[in-house]
Design a protein with these regions (language model features):
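Amphipathic alpha-helical segments enriched in hydrophobic/aromatic and basic residues
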Residues: 31-32, 82, 93
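Basic amphipathic alpha-helical segments that dock to polyanions
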Residues: 54-61
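Amphipathic alpha-helical dimerization/coiled-coil segments
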Residues: 2, 88-120
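N-terminal helix-turn-helix DNA-binding core of bacterial DNA-binding proteins
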Residues: 10-53
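Amphipathic alpha-helical recognition patches that constitute DNA-binding helices
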Residues: 15, 19, 80, 84, ...
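Beta-hairpin "wing" of winged helix-turn-helix
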Residues: 62-79, 84
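Intrinsically disordered, low-complexity serine/threonine- and proline-rich regulatory segments
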Residues: 1-14, 96
Length: 120
């Protein structure tokens, strides 16, 4: 039976926070539901987030001072908490994104050379 969506991806520990920071950096202030939907869209539906997962990340990021929150009105006229990246969060995003790129490059090199050696 064909699938409309790619296989679901289980996020590695800590990667959701990176995705939330990146989403807020790219799109500006958003409410939790909007952040979750944007991550799902950007991942091609490979990452599906429930409310508990996204809000746990938002609380954690707010406690660390990487995002701020304030109440506002959503598109459908409901009260919603909007989250925004702080200057500290911007610095953390840059650090985590660089760390992620370094780790994935190393893993890529190892996977590209399954027989060991220098690859030369």
């Amino acid at each position: 039976m064909p699938h409309d969506h790619p296989a679901r991806v289980d996020l590695l520990q800590g990667t959701l926070d990176l995705l939330v920071l990146q989403t807020l950096d790219a799109l500006g202030p958003l409410h939790g539901f909007g952040i979750a939907r944007r991550i799902e869209q950007a991942s091609g539906q490979a990452v599906l987030l429930n409310q508990g997962t996204i809000y746990a990340s938002l609380v954690r990021l707010q406690q660390r001072g990487w995002i701020s929150a304030e109440w506002g009105t959503s598109d459908n006229n409901r009260r919603a908490k909007y989250y925004a990246l702080t200057k500290t969060g911007q610095k953390q995003l840059e650090k985590e994104a660089n760390d992620w790129r370094r780790v994935t490059a190393v893993i890529g090199r190892v996977l590209a050379n399954p027989h060991g050696g220098s690859g030369q």
